[in-house]
């Protein structure tokens, strides 16, 4: 399950980075939040951190961009996650 979520998460963040003015960003943000909730339910804040770190690294390596600003999309899922 995590592999599917990771690929979907990567695709969504890549889309958001490459299309910052797209009209569907709010729906993308909502899906990212759902992915974060699923990860948290499965493995807590550690699972969230591991997934985001992996995605950040891939985006930096493949696109040369920084995805850190999107960490805030998972705020309010866990008391441990505050960005």
Segment roles from a protein language model:
Residues 1-13, 25-31:
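Short amphipathic alpha-helical heptad-repeat segments
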Residues 3-8, 21, 46, 58, ...:
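Exposed, low-complexity/repetitive linear segments and helix-based recognition motifs
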Residues 10-17, 36-37:
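Amphipathic alpha-helical repeat scaffolds
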Residues 14-26, 43-45:
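Charged, low-complexity interaction regions
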Residues 32, 39-40, 60, 70:
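Compositionally biased, low-complexity repeat tracts
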Residues 34-50:
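Amphipathic alpha-helical coiled-coil segments
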Residues 50-83:
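Amphipathic alpha-helical binding modules
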């Amino acid at each position: 399950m995590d592999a599917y979520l990771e690929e979907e998460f990567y695709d969504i963040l890549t889309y958001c980075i490459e299309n910052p003015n797209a009209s569907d960003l709010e729906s993308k943000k909502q899906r990212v939040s759902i992915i974060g909730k699923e990860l948290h339910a499965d493995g807590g804040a550690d699972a969230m951190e591991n997934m985001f770190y992996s995605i950040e690294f891939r985006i930096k390596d493949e696109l040369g961009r920084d995805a850190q600003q999107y960490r805030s999309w998972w705020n309010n899922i866990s008391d441990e996650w505050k960005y």
